[in-house]
């Protein structure tokens, strides 16, 4: 993972890392306790559950070949009243991180979502402020940066190897922010966040969904180590992205989340194998889904992605080993 983030040819295989992996229960046959279920437990019950969580998560990582794993994040809501899945309240996420690090040792890099850079916000209040009260948006960007840096420090002290800012700045049609807004509210903060994170000895990763083509060149010059998503559903092509950023960025993801959810294992295998053949020689590629791997993703589909990685993920594998008729992805 470190070699990929430093844009060097990995010594053995292309690393696997997911922005968030939610299919722990399906992959293990056990149960990871998160969110409000964890919050309802007594302190003693929470401590016990977090130890079990760490055991399950790390064992699944080893089974699937992950080089890195993202720890549960802070509370946020997918929609009003709908809590995100991979979250823990308050300081529980830091305690869970500590236990994950103890279980994983130095074999698996621990990654945390620190935040640090604004995301697009489609609320009327935010959109109006962009045009009529930009100082308010700038103050929010300052606060987000300060919070992200403090979080990164805390995770650094607990043994993190990398942090990411989940900062969606585009949708499927293109950038949310205008060029002037990017220059004021986004790009300077990416640079400052990446510089601060590097000063802590951590790698700096940015996640953004959407069609980022218009800003790839400038993002590659911000000091980021990696960009995660390369969103296939938004028409982001990995080879075209690589031509723009060259060796300036490690590219993470690009396996279509929709394909993982609804596709056939054979199609997932073929798409992943083609992606690996295209990118592994760069040494600046991390295999994974274009966004979180949801609980609803069938495990045979995810294991088809892993099977392609086993066949095509090594630097010495240059041929196309399609053994689809006999593959068993269970």
Identify the residue ranges that each predicted region occupies:
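Active-site loop segments of alpha/beta catalytic cores
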Residues: 1-46, 50-56, 62, 66-76, ...
